Amino acid sequence: MIDTLCRLLDAGVTQFHVVKKCEDILLDHDYRKLDIGERWELMAGGRYYVKPYPSMLVAFAIGEVPEYGRLNIGLAHTDFPMLKIKTQPDMNRCGYQTLNVEPYGGLIKETWFDRPLGIAGKVVVQTEDSFRPRTYLYDSERAMCIVPSLAPHLRKETTGDKMNVQKELIPVYGLNGQNVKEKDILQYVAEDLGLLKDDILDYDLYLYNMDHMEIVGAEKDMIASPRLDNITSVSALVDTMCKTEKGNCINVISLFDNEEIGSRSKQGADSVMLSGIVDRIMSGLERSEERRVG
């Protein structure tokens, strides 16, 4: 279990990366990917997963003699508090190139100061077919920004909820040198991906803490890491699905997005997606049984 957790904590820098890493782990344990838009024919003893959206995943393992309607379901969320990069984010402030950001989820704001921050998320790019844009998973894999703090004798006593993110939590990504003057942050992202900036149609990008997971304590019995909420739960569920034994149940996990902002999205826990997938699991088993008997 600890191995799965370590891999997810370091690789899961956004909800999209969490789902991609979970997908890789499940594929390594004989899970088969299903297409949400195709008909499913499922087999007793089979292992399957479906990814309705890039930040949501549902996996299920069917028992050898599954009892109709008997399911064990575990839930977790793939997102966590971050700083989200706004549209048209570049700002020049007092000779520094900065980004306009907004809080995503319940940030502990003080913890974002004076840390190396990477940029990650997804980038949507135009292709020759206007109706089929391509989505890239992006991770700068290097510290692109920092939110500097003031010395105690220079700052006001504003902490926690009183802190204004737009005024006091401003990420700096460059000095006002010639190179930075000629580029904005999307130019750097495009170069990392080997693309032209003008080909970028849209993006969903975040700043993330680049600190790595560490085992701490005299007995090495504690973990210090960013993103423990909620990757710990995601890791436990994925690890359980990898080790699940074949019985007479259908074991299901659903990893939702947007819990940090209320879950009321198409990929959130307040959607009808999971109930629809459970219905399709039952229907897929019925079709397989009819074909076997017939």
Model-assigned labels for residue ranges:
Residues M1-R292:
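N-terminal hydrophobic/helix-forming segments and targeting peptides
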